[in-house]
From Swiss-Prot:
Signal sequence interval, chain numbering: none
Name of the protein in its database record: Ferredoxin-like protein FixX
Keyword Phosphoprotein: no
Function (record text): Could be part of an electron transfer system required for anaerobic carnitine reduction. Could be a 3Fe-4S cluster-containing protein.
Key words, A-Z: 4Fe-4S, Electron transport, Iron, Iron-sulfur, Metal-binding, Transport
Family statement drawn from the similarity comment of this UniProt entry: Belongs to the bacterial-type ferredoxin family. FixX subfamily.
A GO molecular-function descriptor: 4 iron, 4 sulfur cluster binding
């Protein structure tokens, strides 16, 4: 019998080379609140976080580049979504 998969452990094995000079995802200045709620629930890496004051915090550094937020929020919540420049981004290690 196998043990349950711990997603946090699996994600922790991946390697991220973050491009600090050029974020590949940028939120709109005034994003649609409903769209942000969808992104909070849909992002598999959990990068959209609701704060105690109701604001949403986002950090592209742990992005899996799956495109979920691009599909769900490009016109409503995101100003820009593109893949990171060459040599940057996620390196999947399939821990």
């Amino acid at each position: 019998m196998t043990s349950p998969v711990n997603v946090d452990v699996k994600l922790g094995v991946n390697k991220f080379n973050v491009d600090e000079d050029s974020p590949h995802i940028i939120l709109k200045t005034d994003p649609d609140k409903q769209a942000l709620e969808v992104l909070i629930k849909a992002c598999p890496a959990g990068l959209y976080k609701k704060q105690d004051d109701g604001s949403v915090r986002f950090d592209y550094a742990g992005c899996l580049e799956c495109g979920t937020c691009r599909i769900l929020g490009l016109d409503t919540a995101l100003e820009k979504w593109e893949y990171p420049r060459g040599t940057f981004g996620v390196e999947f290690r399939y821990g």
